[in-house]
Amino acid sequence: MQVRLMPLPADQWDDEVRGAFKGMLPRDRQNPEGAGTALSTLVRHPDLTKAFLGFNVYLLFRSSLPPRLREVAILRVAHRRHCGYEWEHHVELAEAEGLTGADVEAIRRGAANNEVDQVVLRAVDELDEISTLSDETWAALGEELSDRQRMDLVFTVGAYAMLAMAFNTFGVQLEQEKGK
């Protein structure tokens, strides 16, 4: 993948850049190494970064969607959008939420080891393909999730699809690939 936007160099991190992370990243991570390649790239546009991170922090930490299902959805988005950065980072988060290696591989294939995960995978695929959910999928989600949780699912899928587009377009590399 071609890197189109490099992470912002350390000597260009000013108060505006650090302000984009205020309240969203611990102080010790408000630097190029601590923020990682994705955030260090996004912060080339501090206003956009601050606006997006506020929404993203909600999706990751305050959403009504159960964290395990959130990670099932994000991994499916990352796979469908061919976003290696998103995939690698969220495999770690998924494992922390109890998904196994077999679960992760099943998500990649569009299969699941239980009915709830399978409905979430179907929802991600439908949202990605036709930008809506079929009545059948909406109803199936409703058997397990509240209206708020279904709303959070739709916004999670949309936000991570957009983030995958940005990472892929900008050429954001995994931290271990930086400099290769």
What are these regions, as identified by a protein language model?
Residues 1-65, 170-180:
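Acidic, glycine/proline-rich low-complexity segments that act as flexible tails and inter-domain linkers
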Residues 38, 42, 52-59, 72-78, ...:
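Short alpha-helical scaffolding segments that buttress acidic/His motifs in well-ordered protein cores
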Residues 50, 65, 71-72, 77-97, ...:
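Conserved alpha-helical segments that form or flank metal/cofactor-binding pockets of metalloenzymes
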Residues 93-107, 167-180:
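C-terminal end-helix/capping segment
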Residues 97-123:
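A contiguous pocket-lining binding segment that forms or flanks enzyme active sites
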Residues 113-138, 142:
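Strongly charged, low-complexity linkers/loops
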Residues 146-147:
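Transmembrane-helix boundary/entry motifs in multi-pass membrane transporters
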